[in-house]
Design a protein with these regions (language model features):
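Bacterial Sec-dependent N-terminal signal peptides
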Residues: 1-26
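Contiguous, structured surface segment used for ligand recognition
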Residues: 25-166, 488, 503-534, 538
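Flexible loop/turn segments at secondary-structure boundaries
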Residues: 72, 179-181, 207-213, 281-287, ...
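Feature activates predominantly on carbohydrate-active enzymes
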Residues: 108, 112-314, 318-332, 373, ...
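Active-site neighborhood of glycoside hydrolase catalytic domains
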Residues: 287, 293-297, 301-398, 405-412
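Flexible, acidic glycine-rich loops studded with aromatic residues
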Residues: 385-390, 395-400, 406-548
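Predominantly extracellular/luminal regions of secreted and cell-surface proteins
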Residues: 548-582
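Aromatic, loop-rich ligand-recognition surfaces of beta-strand-rich domains
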Residues: 584-649, 660-698
Length: 698
């Protein structure tokens, strides 16, 4: 999937199509040139589009001409009949629907990551529809565009040339925290196809339950596919206990191997590849419950990590993966690799013996040993390993693909080392976050990601082609700890998945206002088809304070930190608390400063001279699911000389965790004169983080 090679093919493809249009005296504008109303109905936006005169009625008889095989013709006819039920494809119609492979797909050179095979050309006139592509994938996407253009049985005439920007355009669905029926997954595959997405990543195993039938290890589903507590929260509150199907109150389920074969086949008919994820070595409490012999020795507390020193662990994993590969033809197999604590390994005699025998110095290298061994096994079966970006720690397996979720830096570093990467940073791609003003939303996980923020993401950014060529694409992830129902799942997926789809497909994105107009239309289409998206028309939006710059006495003044802020949440550094900038609903937006040290927040602000003060206030962020809490104690001291301080205010607060998300302002009002103000905020018994954005003084 070398970028220059693709661009050559794409430009050649484009020049032929543009030349044909030029013969009619028209020029095909790029996406950035067109008027928004011209493509008001299309997501993702096509690479190039021109509106022409007239319309085509999709009713009555239409002559169907194609050069595909009989089986492919039947599939296309079924797709068209479903999309346009009032249209009859036969030989009697005067109007023509022509769908052609050019060159014939059996002669076309195709590779797994070649985006040109997904491109297509579409021309609609009052009497004819022409769709051309070099593969059935391209023809399929051309028909999807045709479906989106339809309005009450009519198609506006136009010319389109189109091909995706990225080869990988995916979504991950967490099936462990909450189990989703097969029919529900098939429904989401229909929506993915409509949006030209081509990868469904199923997170099939985790502490909350094993969801795939493994015939050699039946206890995985017999003992852990059901649990006590219908929701993930209830399960956690009741001690994370597993159950058997016949137990009273048991909740859960799993996919039989036939279920998964059905899902794979349904997806393949829509040119979607299903990628399975089997977590290892962490997030494996359910495995250890079913097969405790895979646990480390001398474990004194709850542990979710497989014992890497135990050779039976590798026998188990290889046997499981053999059954996985028999069901999923995907080139990629995801092995997780994230958030392993590794603590048990340090005390486990078998793990220590493994480290000594392999010359490993750290437990991170021990995990890398497992990853590399699994990669060799998968490579030997013609597959490629994908892992979350923790697999970068220790030593990256030679042929592994990294799924970068903890920001973009790891992904970029991966590409510079010559490895392929799939970008899925939490700030832009995690669909389990609040999508609007948090108090107005169902409980979500962590922070806030609006449709606009999601749409703003560009995986390659301004990276040079030599690096960008290793970015396979992007993926939206829906973790489902706080998503207990199917309607809620769709509420979190849509409309933000529309932004993921356009970010993965479109070369020259339009402005957000244009995209939002198109998203509103697609939202209505989804509702008409039985989906349950968030209603974008009711969106409240970003925190109002973030949209303005504050002016107060402390702006630009010197700040001394007696306790450091966290390196991974620095905001704007030493000036963050006096820069006049408020944070929004996202604690990772670069305006909130995070504190996790023993003393949490402890700073002194020098106003430069003694000044009268009537108000000192600070806003604090709370997200219980992210272990961020408002302070349990705030103390303010003042001084004229910076040496001798007097207490101005000292208050204790009860931290209310009944509300997952809030921004709380704590303030002192009165009258005092001072030059130095020391502000301290401490945590209570809950511990966790403290986040604030500004200490305001008036």
């Amino acid at each position: 999937m070398i970028m220059k090679h693709f661009l050559f093919l794409f430009l050649a493809f484009s020049s032929c199509f543009v030349s044909a249009l030029a013969a009619d005296g028209e020029r095909l504008p790029a996406v950035g040139e067109r008027l928004a109303e011209d493509v008001a109905r299309l997501i993702p936006a096509p690479a190039a589009y021109v509106k022409t005169e007239g319309e085509m009625k999709m009713t009555g008889h239409m002559r169907f001409v194609t050069n595909v095989t009989a089986q492919e013709r039947k599939a296309l006819q079924g797709l068209l009949a479903e999309a346009f039920p009032a249209m009859q494809l036969d030989r009697r119609g005067k109007r023509v629907l022509q769908i052609r492979l050019t060159p014939p797909h059996h002669e076309a050179k195709q590779t797994a990551n070649d985006r040109s095979e997904e491109g297509y050309q579409l021309r609609i006139t009052p009497r004819d529809i022409h769709i051309e592509a070099s593969s059935m994938k391209g023809l399929f996407y051309g028909v999807q565009t045709l479906r989106q253009l339809e309005e009450q049985g009519r198609l506006a005439c136009c010319d389109i040339k189109d091909a995706p920007k990225y080869a990988y355009r995916g979504v991950m669905l967490d099936c462990s925290r909450h189990f989703w029926p097969k029919e529900f997954i098939l429904k989401q595959l229909d929506a993915m196809a409509y949006l030209k997405m081509n990868r469904l990543h199923l997170h099939l195993t985790d502490d909350a339950g094993w969801r795939m039938e493994i015939k050699q290890y039946p206890a995985l589903t017999e003992k852990t596919a059901w649990r006590v507590g219908a929701t993930w929260n209830e399960w956690r509150e009741q001690g994370q206990r597993y159950a058997r199907k016949e137990d009273k109150g048991a909740a859960g389920g799993y996919y039989t191997q036939q279920d998964l074969k059905d899902i794979v086949a349904y997806a393949a008919a829509r040119h979607i590849t299903v990628i399975p994820e089997i977590e290892m070595p962490g997030h494996s409490a359910e495995v250890l419950h079913a097969y405790p012999e895979l646990q480390c020795e001398q474990v004194s507390q709850r542990n979710s990590d497989l014992c890497v020193g135990n050779e039976q662990t590798f026998v188990f994993l290889e046997n499981v993966l053999r059954e996985v590969m028999n069901i999923f033809p995907s080139k990629y197999i995801h092995i997780g690799g994230d958030e392993a604590s590794r603590q048990a390994w340090a005390a486990c005699p078998r793990c220590q013996q493994r480290m000594k025998a392999e010359g490993l110095q750290t437990v991170a290298e021990l995990q890398a040993y497992l990853t590399q061994r699994m990669e060799r096994f998968l490579n030997g079966h013609g597959r490629v390993l994908i892992g979350w970006d923790e697999i970068l720690e220790g030593q990256l397996a030679p042929n592994a693909v990294v799924m970068s979720w903890r920001g973009e830096e790891g992904g970029i570093a991966t590409t510079k080392a010559g490895h392929d990467v799939i970008m899925t940073p939490g700030r832009y791609c995690y669909l389990d976050r609040y999508q609007d003003y948090p108090p107005s939303q169902p409980q979500a996980f962590g922070s806030y990601m609006s449709l606009e923020q999601c749409y703003a993401y560009d995986p390659a950014g301004h990276l040079p082609d030599s690096i960008a060529k290793h970015i396979l694409g992007l993926q939206g992830n829906l973790w489902t700890e706080q998503v207990p129902t199917m309607a809620h799942c769709e509420y979190m997926l849509y409309p933000r998945l529309l932004a993921i789809a356009e970010n993965g497909w479109s070369h020259g994105k339009t402005d957000y206002a244009d995209f939002r107009r198109r998203a509103l239309h697609l939202q209505d289409v989804l509702v008409s088809r039985g989906y349950h998206p968030f209603d974008l028309r009711k969106e409240v939006g970003e925190r109002a304070e973030k949209k303005t710059v504050m002016q107060h006495l402390a702006v630009g003044k010197r700040v001394v930190y007696h306790a450091p802020y966290a390196a991974n949440y620095p905001a704007s550094g030493d000036e963050a608390l006096v820069d006049g900038k408020s944070g929004g609903w996202d604690f990772q937006d670069g305006a909130w400063q995070g504190f996790i040290g023993a003393d949490r927040l402890d700073v002194t602000i020098d106003l430069g001279e003694i000044k009268p003060l009537k108000l000192i206030k600070a806003a604090f962020f709370q997200s219980v699911s992210a272990e961020i809490y408002t302070p349990a104690e705030v103390e303010i001291l003042v001084s004229d000389d910076g040496v001798h301080f007097e207490q101005l205010d000292h208050r204790r607060y009860e931290v209310d965790t009944s509300t997952d998300f809030k921004v709380q302002t704590m303030e002192w009002c009165g009258a005092v004169k001072a030059r130095f103000i020391r502000y301290q905020a401490k945590s209570g018994q809950l511990g966790g983080w403290i986040f604030t954005d500004e200490i305001c003084m008036q």
